[in-house]
């Protein structure tokens, strides 16, 4: 008689984990008497293997309370010196625990793999767009997970929106993760279709020559996007500012149109 798939569901118990009671030895006299009695009454004898099989089938449908009783019996047998039955099969929680990296090398390797899966690994000269709250910060990738970017002179202002209103900036060589401040990022060489990038060695030379220099900063004419585009293409350009100016012009035009409409004399109706 086969078991349905539901038997191995919530109320199923793996038989390998349940310590079955040891069969007691029956004397030959009692065995003979029982066989004679069964023969006299006309009942057939049931082999022990069939009884154990029936018991195994019933165990599949035992409620949770009986499961707990089985576990208590297993604990008592362990305390009495009996060797508990162990299963070599790993549970999902054990599998997850074993996959967690423990050593520093494993952690660093995992982080690098996750970074590669989330974003392609940058190459020297690639532009990095960092999505901060309210604006996008830009940097240029150099080597060994390090970038060069414009930053305010005060470290307290780094990563803050107030940094975009400063009139000075310092060119810094920093680790990418230190520049992110928990923000997301991506490689964005979007002007490659408009301008031909300079040779990589020239980009790197120009970039390294700017490190630690203090430069004039202007949100409209010389921000971080102007800076990295100038290093890669030789053209200081910021599409972020261009889009803002276009949207501002549209908004100003809409306001002006509304004002003109409001002051325009209306025709008198009879």
UniProtKB/Swiss-Prot annotation:
<comment type="similarity">
    <text>Belongs to the H-rev107 family.</text>
</comment>
<dbReference type="Pfam" id="PF04970">
    <property type="entry name" value="LRAT"/>
</dbReference>
<feature type="active site">
    <location>
        <position position="149"/>
    </location>
</feature>
<dbReference type="GO" id="GO:0004623">
    <property type="term" value="F:phospholipase A2 activity"/>
</dbReference>
<dbReference type="InterPro" id="IPR007053">
    <property type="entry name" value="LRAT_dom"/>
</dbReference>
<protein>
    <recommendedName>
        <fullName>Phospholipase A and acyltransferase 5</fullName>
        <ecNumber>2.3.1.-</ecNumber>
        <ecNumber>3.1.1.32</ecNumber>
        <ecNumber>3.1.1.4</ecNumber>
    </recommendedName>
</protein>
<keyword id="KW-0963">Cytoplasm</keyword>
<feature type="active site" description="Acyl-thioester intermediate">
    <location>
        <position position="224"/>
    </location>
</feature>
<dbReference type="GO" id="GO:0005829">
    <property type="term" value="C:cytosol"/>
</dbReference>
<feature type="domain" description="LRAT">
    <location>
        <begin position="127"/>
        <end position="240"/>
    </location>
</feature>
<feature type="active site">
    <location>
        <position position="137"/>
    </location>
</feature>
<feature type="compositionally biased region" description="Polar residues">
    <location>
        <begin position="100"/>
        <end position="116"/>
    </location>
</feature>
<dbReference type="InterPro" id="IPR051496">
    <property type="entry name" value="H-rev107_PLA/AT"/>
</dbReference>
<keyword id="KW-0808">Transferase</keyword>
<feature type="region of interest" description="Disordered">
    <location>
        <begin position="70"/>
        <end position="122"/>
    </location>
</feature>
<keyword id="KW-0012">Acyltransferase</keyword>
<feature type="region of interest" description="Disordered">
    <location>
        <begin position="1"/>
        <end position="54"/>
    </location>
</feature>
<dbReference type="GO" id="GO:0016410">
    <property type="term" value="F:N-acyltransferase activity"/>
</dbReference>
<dbReference type="GO" id="GO:0070292">
    <property type="term" value="P:N-acylphosphatidylethanolamine metabolic process"/>
</dbReference>
<keyword id="KW-0378">Hydrolase</keyword>
<keyword id="KW-0443">Lipid metabolism</keyword>
<dbReference type="GO" id="GO:0008970">
    <property type="term" value="F:phospholipase A1 activity"/>
</dbReference>
<comment type="function">
    <text>Exhibits both phospholipase A1/2 and acyltransferase activities. Shows phospholipase A1 (PLA1) and A2 (PLA2) activity, catalyzing the calcium-independent release of fatty acids from the sn-1 or sn-2 position of glycerophospholipids. Shows N-acyltransferase activity, catalyzing the calcium-independent transfer of a fatty acyl group at the sn-1 position of phosphatidylcholine (PC) and other glycerophospholipids to the primary amine of phosphatidylethanolamine (PE), forming N-acylphosphatidylethanolamine (NAPE), which serves as precursor for N-acylethanolamines (NAEs).</text>
</comment>
<feature type="compositionally biased region" description="Polar residues">
    <location>
        <begin position="24"/>
        <end position="54"/>
    </location>
</feature>
